[in-house]
Protein backbone atom coordinates (compact mmCIF):
# COMPACT_ATOMS: atom_id res chain seq x y z
CA UNK A 1 0.00 0.00 0.00
CA UNK A 2 1.25 3.48 -0.90
CA UNK A 3 0.68 4.97 2.55
CA UNK A 4 2.80 2.23 4.13
CA UNK A 5 5.70 2.98 1.80
CA UNK A 6 5.39 6.68 2.47
CA UNK A 7 5.59 6.17 6.23
CA UNK A 8 8.52 3.77 5.85
CA UNK A 9 10.36 6.37 3.78
CA UNK A 10 9.47 9.38 5.92
CA UNK A 11 10.03 9.60 9.65
CA UNK A 12 8.53 13.09 9.42
CA UNK A 13 5.23 11.69 8.14
CA UNK A 14 5.20 9.08 10.92
CA UNK A 15 5.86 11.86 13.45
CA UNK A 16 3.03 14.02 12.08
CA UNK A 17 0.53 11.16 12.12
CA UNK A 18 1.64 10.12 15.60
CA UNK A 19 1.21 13.65 16.95
CA UNK A 20 -2.25 13.93 15.43
CA UNK A 21 -3.36 10.63 16.93
CA UNK A 22 -1.89 11.54 20.32
CA UNK A 23 -3.75 14.85 20.25
CA UNK A 24 -7.01 13.10 19.48
CA UNK A 25 -6.47 10.58 22.29
CA UNK A 26 -5.79 13.44 24.73
CA UNK A 27 -9.14 14.95 23.73
CA UNK A 28 -10.91 11.63 24.25
CA UNK A 29 -9.26 11.13 27.63
CA UNK A 30 -10.04 14.65 28.83
CA UNK A 31 -13.70 14.52 27.81
CA UNK A 32 -14.44 11.02 29.09
CA UNK A 33 -15.73 10.35 32.60
CA UNK A 34 -13.49 7.44 33.60
CA UNK A 35 -14.10 4.77 36.20
CA UNK A 36 -10.74 3.35 37.24
CA UNK A 37 -10.42 -0.24 38.42
CA UNK A 38 -7.22 -1.64 39.88
CA UNK A 39 -5.10 1.47 39.33
CA UNK A 40 -4.14 1.63 43.00
CA UNK A 41 -3.01 -2.01 42.91
CA UNK A 42 -0.75 -1.24 39.96
CA UNK A 43 0.67 1.84 41.65
CA UNK A 44 1.41 -0.17 44.80
CA UNK A 45 3.24 -2.78 42.73
CA UNK A 46 5.23 -0.10 40.90
CA UNK A 47 6.38 1.26 44.25
CA UNK A 48 8.16 -2.08 44.68
CA UNK A 49 9.66 -2.21 41.19
CA UNK A 50 8.89 -2.76 37.49
CA UNK A 51 6.06 -4.92 36.16
CA UNK A 52 5.22 -6.62 32.88
CA UNK A 53 2.05 -5.14 31.36
CA UNK A 54 0.07 -7.29 28.91
CA UNK A 55 -3.01 -6.34 26.90
CA UNK A 56 -4.98 -7.47 23.90
CA UNK A 57 -3.93 -5.58 20.78
CA UNK A 58 -7.41 -4.04 20.37
CA UNK A 59 -6.80 -1.93 23.51
CA UNK A 60 -3.51 -0.44 22.27
CA UNK A 61 -4.72 3.09 21.58
CA UNK A 62 -5.53 4.17 25.14
CA UNK A 63 -2.86 2.12 26.93
CA UNK A 64 -0.20 4.90 26.77
CA UNK A 65 -2.76 7.44 28.00
CA UNK A 66 -3.75 5.45 31.07
CA UNK A 67 -0.28 4.35 32.18
CA UNK A 68 0.55 6.06 35.54
CA UNK A 69 3.82 7.59 34.38
CA UNK A 70 4.56 9.40 37.62
CA UNK A 71 4.71 6.02 39.36
CA UNK A 72 7.16 4.45 36.91
CA UNK A 73 8.38 4.45 33.33
CA UNK A 74 7.04 1.97 30.77
CA UNK A 75 9.10 0.64 27.89
CA UNK A 76 6.57 -0.59 25.36
CA UNK A 77 7.62 -3.16 22.77
CA UNK A 78 6.57 -2.46 19.18
CA UNK A 79 7.31 -3.86 15.75
CA UNK A 80 9.07 -1.96 12.97
CA UNK A 81 6.11 -1.85 10.56
CA UNK A 82 4.72 1.53 9.42
CA UNK A 83 1.90 1.21 11.94
CA UNK A 84 4.50 0.32 14.58
CA UNK A 85 6.46 3.46 13.72
CA UNK A 86 3.40 5.66 14.20
CA UNK A 87 2.52 3.79 17.38
CA UNK A 88 6.01 4.49 18.70
CA UNK A 89 5.50 8.22 18.16
CA UNK A 90 2.16 8.11 19.98
CA UNK A 91 3.72 6.27 22.91
CA UNK A 92 6.59 8.76 23.08
CA UNK A 93 4.13 11.67 23.12
CA UNK A 94 2.72 10.27 26.36
CA UNK A 95 6.17 9.94 27.91
CA UNK A 96 6.73 6.23 27.34
CA UNK A 97 9.99 4.71 26.13
CA UNK A 98 9.09 2.48 23.15
CA UNK A 99 11.49 -0.18 21.93
CA UNK A 100 11.41 -1.37 18.32
CA UNK A 101 11.61 -5.16 18.07
CA UNK A 102 13.11 -5.84 14.66
CA UNK A 103 12.98 -9.29 13.09
CA UNK A 104 16.70 -8.81 12.40
CA UNK A 105 17.42 -8.43 16.12
CA UNK A 106 18.65 -11.65 17.69
CA UNK A 107 16.85 -13.07 20.70
CA UNK A 108 20.00 -12.52 22.75
CA UNK A 109 20.25 -8.84 21.77
CA UNK A 110 16.57 -8.26 22.48
CA UNK A 111 16.77 -10.00 25.84
CA UNK A 112 19.85 -8.04 26.83
CA UNK A 113 18.22 -4.71 25.97
CA UNK A 114 14.95 -5.51 27.73
CA UNK A 115 16.72 -6.73 30.86
CA UNK A 116 18.84 -3.57 30.83
CA UNK A 117 15.69 -1.46 30.83
CA UNK A 118 14.16 -3.47 33.66
CA UNK A 119 17.35 -2.99 35.68
CA UNK A 120 16.89 0.75 35.11
CA UNK A 121 13.50 0.44 36.79
CA UNK A 122 11.39 0.51 33.62
CA UNK A 123 8.35 -1.72 33.26
CA UNK A 124 7.81 -3.67 30.04
CA UNK A 125 4.58 -3.45 28.05
CA UNK A 126 3.46 -5.68 25.18
CA UNK A 127 0.38 -7.10 23.51
CA UNK A 128 -0.51 -10.69 24.21
CA UNK A 129 -1.71 -11.38 20.67
CA UNK A 130 0.31 -8.87 18.65
CA UNK A 131 1.56 -7.72 16.33
CA UNK A 132 -0.64 -9.59 13.85
CA UNK A 133 -2.70 -12.14 15.76
CA UNK A 134 -4.43 -14.51 15.79
CA UNK A 135 -6.80 -12.38 17.81
CA UNK A 136 -7.07 -13.23 21.52
CA UNK A 137 -4.49 -16.01 21.29
CA UNK A 138 -1.69 -15.50 23.81
CA UNK A 139 1.79 -15.87 22.36
CA UNK A 140 4.82 -16.98 24.33
CA UNK A 141 6.47 -13.54 24.44
CA UNK A 142 4.53 -12.33 27.48
CA UNK A 143 5.36 -15.48 29.42
CA UNK A 144 8.97 -15.39 28.28
CA UNK A 145 9.48 -11.83 29.53
CA UNK A 146 7.69 -12.54 32.80
CA UNK A 147 10.01 -15.48 33.32
CA UNK A 148 13.17 -13.63 32.27
CA UNK A 149 12.52 -10.52 34.36
CA UNK A 150 10.83 -12.09 37.38
CA UNK A 151 8.47 -9.09 37.44
CA UNK A 152 4.80 -9.35 38.43
CA UNK A 153 2.38 -9.34 35.50
CA UNK A 154 -0.57 -6.96 35.14
CA UNK A 155 -3.23 -7.06 32.43
CA UNK A 156 -4.98 -3.99 31.05
CA UNK A 157 -8.23 -3.26 29.23
CA UNK A 158 -10.55 -0.33 28.65
CA UNK A 159 -13.93 0.41 27.11
CA UNK A 160 -16.03 3.49 26.35
CA UNK A 161 -19.74 3.80 25.70
CA UNK A 162 -19.09 5.76 22.52
CA UNK A 163 -16.53 4.21 20.20
CA UNK A 164 -15.93 2.78 16.77
CA UNK A 165 -14.57 -0.64 15.88
CA UNK A 166 -11.93 -0.39 13.18
CA UNK A 167 -11.79 -2.87 10.32
CA UNK A 168 -8.47 -4.32 11.44
CA UNK A 169 -7.46 -7.90 12.24
CA UNK A 170 -8.05 -7.21 15.96
CA UNK A 171 -11.15 -4.98 15.54
CA UNK A 172 -9.26 -2.21 17.32
CA UNK A 173 -11.35 0.08 19.51
CA UNK A 174 -11.27 3.75 18.54
CA UNK A 175 -12.67 5.81 21.44
CA UNK A 176 -14.90 8.78 20.77
CA UNK A 177 -14.91 11.94 22.92
CA UNK A 178 -17.57 13.08 25.39
CA UNK A 179 -18.56 9.73 26.84
CA UNK A 180 -18.12 7.40 29.81
CA UNK A 181 -15.45 4.76 30.10
CA UNK A 182 -13.75 2.19 32.31
CA UNK A 183 -10.02 1.45 32.49
CA UNK A 184 -8.85 -1.70 34.23
CA UNK A 185 -5.57 -3.01 35.62
CA UNK A 186 -5.57 -6.46 37.21
CA UNK A 187 -2.69 -8.46 38.57
CA UNK A 188 -2.22 -11.89 37.07
CA UNK A 189 -1.83 -14.18 40.05
CA UNK A 190 0.08 -17.00 38.33
CA UNK A 191 3.87 -17.24 38.39
CA UNK A 192 6.01 -18.36 35.46
CA UNK A 193 8.74 -20.74 36.68
CA UNK A 194 12.26 -20.49 35.31
CA UNK A 195 11.81 -23.89 33.73
CA UNK A 196 8.45 -25.16 32.56
CA UNK A 197 7.57 -28.07 30.28
CA UNK A 198 5.23 -27.69 27.31
CA UNK A 199 2.10 -28.73 29.19
CA UNK A 200 2.81 -26.21 31.95
CA UNK A 201 3.37 -23.43 29.40
CA UNK A 202 0.11 -24.30 27.66
CA UNK A 203 -1.69 -24.02 30.98
CA UNK A 204 -0.08 -20.66 31.70
CA UNK A 205 -1.05 -19.33 28.27
CA UNK A 206 -4.65 -20.38 28.86
CA UNK A 207 -4.64 -18.79 32.31
CA UNK A 208 -3.21 -15.51 31.01
CA UNK A 209 -5.75 -15.51 28.21
CA UNK A 210 -8.51 -15.89 30.79
CA UNK A 211 -7.06 -12.98 32.80
CA UNK A 212 -7.00 -10.77 29.70
CA UNK A 213 -10.57 -11.71 28.83
CA UNK A 214 -11.69 -11.07 32.41
CA UNK A 215 -10.14 -7.59 32.36
CA UNK A 216 -11.95 -6.88 29.09
CA UNK A 217 -15.25 -7.99 30.60
CA UNK A 218 -14.65 -5.90 33.73
CA UNK A 219 -14.00 -2.83 31.58
CA UNK A 220 -17.42 -2.79 29.98
CA UNK A 221 -19.15 0.45 31.11
Where are these regions (language model features)?
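Generic beta-sheet signal
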Residues: 101, 127, 155-158
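A cross-family acyltransferase "interaction/gating" segment
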Residues: 137-196
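Short, well-ordered, mixed-charge alpha-helical segments that flank or form enzyme active sites
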Residues: 107-112, 133-136, 162-166
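Catalytic core of membrane glycerolipid acyltransferases/transacylases, capturing the structured
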Residues: 49-105, 149, 164
Amino acid sequence: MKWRRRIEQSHLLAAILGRMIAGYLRLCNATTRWTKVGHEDLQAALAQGPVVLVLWHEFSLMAPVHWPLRHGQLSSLRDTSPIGMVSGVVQSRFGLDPMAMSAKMSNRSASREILRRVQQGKSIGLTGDGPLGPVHVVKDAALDWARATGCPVFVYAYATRRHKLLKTWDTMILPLPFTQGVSVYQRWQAEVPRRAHDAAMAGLRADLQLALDTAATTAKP
